[in-house]
Amino acid sequence: MTTYLEDLTEGLKIETERRVVTAGDIDAFVELSGDRNALHTDDGYARSAGFAGRIAHGLLVLSLESGLSSEADEWAIGAYLEESRRFVEPVLPGDEIHSVSEITRVRRSRSKPDRGIVTLHVETRNQREEIVLEGTDVVMVGARGDA
């Protein structure tokens, strides 16, 4: 079912499915991004830097969050206008992540009255419910009718 601006209210929470981050995911992101930093490719180096082993790229975790979120809702339009994140804790192979978003603002667009602007606070958490990534999204959402 498609969700429109009129269906969304401040305080509404949206939780995604869960997904395990694998070593293969990290390896694929190394190849895709070209980011071969040893924190992502070498367990020994990552341990010497104070981590439990190699860690996922922050942008990999953000990309996975985006994919999980896109499957959690069917918003009309749903185009990102702004996105900001803070990388809080490392994600290691075998960690299971999911995201919880809370709508903090809903308003009709002034320039496009057939659309609205929705602001969300987003937290991506691991299997221990520790926040690993958090921030804000601003998205454009279709409305059912004119203002």
Q: Language-model segments: which ranges?
A:
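HotDog/MaoC-like acyl-thioester-processing domains
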Residues: 2-10, 91-95, 100-147
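Mid-chain, well-packed structural core segment of small domains
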Residues: 74-95, 99
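Short, intrinsically disordered/low-complexity patches at protein termini
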Residues: 38-40, 79-80, 85-87, 117, ...
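Hot-dog-fold acyl-thioester-processing enzymes
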Residues: 1-82, 144-147
